[in-house]
Structures are given as structure tokens and as C-alpha cells.
């Protein structure tokens, strides 16, 4: 069975160019998605039940929000009729590097403020930028994974502006000659794209460029701002998509998919949820039945006038901000107004974007080549080595999980890939490997699928439920993969029942250190199967006591009530001796006969 995990990148050892001293990169981890739960039950509060005031207010707020959302959705559908939305995205991601881009100071997100600072980071007179070669590796991995053409030669430019977080008065970037061009990303229906986009949609990537981050500002009311220069010159990549997206949901799915790819390749530090990635979106609208608009950017003509929304920090913010700006522009145009060229902002929970400033153009930033930095020359051997060692990407992982080796459904495969920054998938793989070792005599696709599905059920649902109930984050050491595999093996060999397996799992989760076999023996939990006559006697006693329910099953075909009889048999029978499947067979035979 193929391994899905790559723990280290050792590309430097395979280079045909001059060796670089590159710090060892951490293990690949996929991201943990943000999850949204919408309460659709209109009858949450029941007058006959006591509900604490705090809970009642919370539930009423949920209902009001849901109703507002539903109403807004209908309004949007009506307002959007006859209009075409176009969106382009710019994603800024902090690279996973121990070195800064242009100084020898280390990077850190937890160090004391202003402790990881070099003279160049503070723009001391006479200090010079020193490009750190190690920062290039995560950037190249990201560009390769996003199907970009790596440029043999690229150059750095200065982007001039004056603000407190940039002491030099300019940012070093790659505006004119970036290191990667002409990439693309494929989005599928399971990524969450809009239904009108069909099964899949391709979004082209114009370029990916290296650039330096700015200082971090800490506001201290009423009027002070503290600056932490640890973040200055932290290496960033800016990923610029073409304006080819036409729905808010697909735009959010695009950002989410790009983040997943960046984290799968260990190219970035963290995702949006921890501030390691942020997005700007360019939004424009035009009437579908009108002549092409005068707007143009990145070579795409006929667009409406665009605005840019800056610093969106979640997938939901991307979607909601685009919806709000689309509707605002439509209202402006329908009232006879003109959409202004400007930069706008968005706050979580808002219903409208807000103007920040008139949008700067190329002339405003006064881009010019940086005279202190040589051209960046990337050897083909380095690119080839990184391609050869690139780990499996999210789509590839999904294909392997739902393929013949594991046989999972898409509904189970996606959470394994997405949850817990990739730790759940790694743990699942360890459980499957341990199961294969325990059942080494069984081989073939059928056995693999059986073990793969069983492991997924227990890793995702049973063990996942215990973490959720205890309100703790996922931790693989809570129950070792070997221990869970042994428990599943006992269940598959019918040495214990499913209810006993869940009981044992909970005991170990709460700290029981006994080995599985010892725990089962000492707690007298091993299955001692009932005979057929014992099953029949137990079922008959329940059938005789519940003639009305039997009639409903026979006459009204209410087969779901068979499960009630099974549950009662497991409750009334001696602990650990009643198997649900066997009990259901007996109940069906006695009530339905030959049916």
C-alpha cells in the first residue's frame, strides 16, 4: 500500500548545481479548514422547556442571522440577474524558512519583539541586502506545485511608498521579472466551487513573485503604535491569478485550494487562520447585454471598473467581501453612478466594504530595479530535483484514498486530507500500516479496502468524536496508532462487539494504560457468543412484550423499528455477548419470516 506522507525534503543532495546549505524543512502538513455550522432548526427554543437566558439569546441571534442570510441571498439573486462578476486574487503567503529574505537574522513568530533584527531590516545607512538562497526552496516548491514555468533569470525591484512599517521607504519585490509565470490551478465541485461553474474550472496564475514582509504594528490606544521589526524581510510570495473567476464561492474555493497546496508542499508557515496567508481581491461587474467595458488588467479586456479589497484573512471573508462589493457596484451603476478606482477594506461581520484610499497605480509606486541586488539565476538541476521530491498534493491524496488501495468514499477522504494540519491523515496511515502488519496473511484490494474503511471510521468518527466531546485538539499520542489498530483487529476478528470496542476506546482515551489484550481479559469484555437458541429466546421475549410494534413492522413496513429490537437485545443481554448483526438477522427472521 503506498505511503501518502513525505517527512523531509532532501533536494539539496540531488542537485547538479553548486550545493546550497539549506536548513532541514519540517514535515509536510496539510491545513485545518475553518468549519461553519448553521442552525436551520426554526424551533430550537421550545416554550415548555426551561432554557437559560444566555442560551435563549444566543439561539435567537442565530435564527435572526439565518433569516437575514436567507433574505439577503434572495435579494442577491435578484440583484445579480443580468450582471457578470469578475474576480482576480492576489495571495500573500509567508514562506517556511528559517532565514529572512535579505538579511542573516532568523525568522520567528514567537520571539520577543525586535530581537530578530539585522541592520538592513531597520534600513541603517550603509546596510546592504544579502539574498539568502535557502528562502528560494519553499518558493520554488510552491511554484512547481501550482504548475508554473520557472524563470531561469529573475530580478528584484523597489516598490516605493512611505509608511511606518517599512523603514526603508520601499519594499523589495519582483514586479517586472518574477521567478515564476504562467501557472494554473484546477478547482473541482468537491472543492466547493459554485454550481454554475460545473464539475471543474481552471484558474490561470499570471505570476508568483518573491517579496519582503513589513514590520508588525501593535496599536496601543489612544494614539500610540508599537512596531515589531522581527517580521521585516520575512520572505513572502505573492500569487497573482488572472481575472477569470465569476462567483464568490469559487473565489473562496480558489484561495482555500491554493492554501492547501502550499501547506502540502511545506512552502508556508501557517494558513489564514494564524495570519500566515492573506488575500486581496479585485472585483468588477458589467452588464451581460452591454458592450464590453473599458476596464482592463493583466491583458483581459472588456471588464468593468475594478476595485481592490485588501487584507482578507479567512475564506469566509473572501466570499462575503466579494458579495458585498459586487452588490455595492451594481447599486452604484443602476443608480447612474460610476465605480471609482479605489482600495477598499472589509471587516468581519460587515455587510458593506469601506473606502480606504484611491488606488495607487504603477506610477505612484515608482517601481525601479534594485541596484543593490544581482539577478536571481535558478539552475535547471535545482528545479528538476524539487520536482522529483515534491510530495503528493491534495488532489493526488484524494485519488489514492478513494482508489483501490483504501476504497474510501469522498466524504471520508476529504476530512482525512484536510483536518488537523495533516496530522489526522498521517495517523490514519499509521493505523492502516499497523492493521496490515497484524493481518499480514490477508492481501489484495478487497482486504485493503476493508482495513482502510474500518480505520477511517474509527479515526474520523469514533476517535474524532472523543476529541470533540472532550473539547481538546487532535493529538496522535492520546491513543497510539498501534493500540487503535489492535482494537480494530479484535473487532474485525469478532472477538469483541462494536459497543465494547467503543467502551475500550473511551477507557484508553481517558488514560487507561493497559494493553488491549490485558484490558479485555481483566474487564471480562471478550465476546462469548450466544447460541442461536439464546438469540431466539431473547428476541421472542421482546416480540411478545411489544405486539403493537411488531404489527407496525409487518403491516406498515416500518422496518426502522427493527433497530429498536436489536438495541433492546444488546441492552438486556449479557454484556459483550450480543452481536448487533446477528441479533438483526434473528429479529427479521422471527418478525418477517421469509421476507
UniProtKB/Swiss-Prot annotation:
Q: Which GO terms describe its biological process?
A: glutaminyl-tRNAGln biosynthesis via transamidation; mitochondrial translation
Q: Does the keyword Chloroplast apply?
A: no
**What Gene Ontology molecular-function terms does this entry list?**
ATP binding; glutaminyl-tRNA synthase (glutamine-hydrolyzing) activity
From which residue to which does any coiled coil extend? none
| Xref: InterPro entries | Asn/Gln-tRNA_amidoTrfase_suB/E, Asn/Gln-tRNA_Trfase_suB/E_cat, Asn/Gln_amidotransferase, Asn/Gln_tRNA_amidoTrase-B-like, GatB, GatB_Yqey_C_2, Gln-tRNA_amidoTrfase_suB_CS, Gln_synth/guanido_kin_cat_dom
Q: Where in the cell is it found?
A: Mitochondrion
User: Which UniProt keywords are listed?
Assistant: ATP-binding, Ligase, Mitochondrion, Nucleotide-binding, Protein biosynthesis, Transit peptide
The first-level EC class reads ligase
State which Enzyme Commission number(s) the record gives: 6.3.5.-
One Pfam family, short name: GatB_N
- What is the name of the protein in this document? Glutamyl-tRNA(Gln) amidotransferase subunit B, mitochondrial
Q: Which organism is it from?
A: Talaromyces marneffei (strain ATCC 18224 / CBS 334.59 / QM 7333)
